[in-house]
């Protein structure tokens, strides 16, 4: 996908789960490599779905080394000069309240914006953390429309 996009002067963003850093593969030469490391080498942008409902929990998923991983997502992105976009969940979900900002946003309109500002401040040492993706933002929009 990346080669095709490059040939057409298009950009590609790889949207991946936060636990991708835990996985390795063996290449044709028999060398074991990290999947996320490879993706950040060939891509200009990755979106890491860091679905948690607090700044500290999101920060742990992207800036700390996960169990079973050798490096953090930020370590790979920084080493390979790849932008790391942090994906935040905004929809009501059956996966549990801890994976989405839906409930917090209903209780305190604008909460997700304050969390983004907190993450930006806390992780300011990383040059490639400046972008965020709010997944299922339409849920928040519909909620705001109904309360007006």
For each feature predicted by the language model, list its residue ranges.
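Aromatic-residue detector
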Residues: 15, 60-61, 140
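Aromatic-lined carbohydrate-recognition surfaces of secreted/lumenal glycan-active proteins
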Residues: 1-32, 79-93, 133-137
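Substrate-binding cleft of secreted/luminal carbohydrate-active enzymes
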Residues: 47-57, 71-148
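Proteins with a high burden of low-complexity, intrinsically disordered sequence enriched in S/T/G/P/A and R
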Residues: 3-4, 66-67, 71, 108
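Glycine-enriched alpha-helix->loop->beta-strand junction motifs that scaffold or abut catalytic
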Residues: 41-46
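Alpha-helical scaffolding within the catalytic cores
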Residues: 22-39, 58-76, 117
């Amino acid at each position: 996908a990346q080669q095709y996009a490059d040939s057409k002067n298009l950009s590609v963003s790889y949207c991946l789960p936060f636990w991708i850093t835990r996985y390795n593969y063996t290449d044709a030469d028999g060398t074991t490599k990290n999947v996320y490391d490879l993706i950040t080498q060939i891509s200009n942008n990755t979106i890491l779905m860091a679905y948690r409902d607090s700044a500290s929990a999101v920060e742990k998923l992207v800036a700390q080394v996960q169990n079973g991983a050798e490096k953090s997502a930020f370590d790979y992105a920084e080493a390979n000069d790849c932008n790391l976009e942090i994906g935040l969940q905004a929809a009501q979900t059956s996966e549990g309240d801890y994976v989405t900002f839906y409930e917090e946003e209903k209780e305190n309109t604008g909460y997700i914006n304050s969390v983004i500002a907190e993450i930006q401040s806390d992780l300011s040492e990383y040059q490639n953390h400046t972008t965020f993706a709010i997944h299922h933002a339409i849920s928040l929009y519909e909620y705001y429309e109904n309360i007006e």
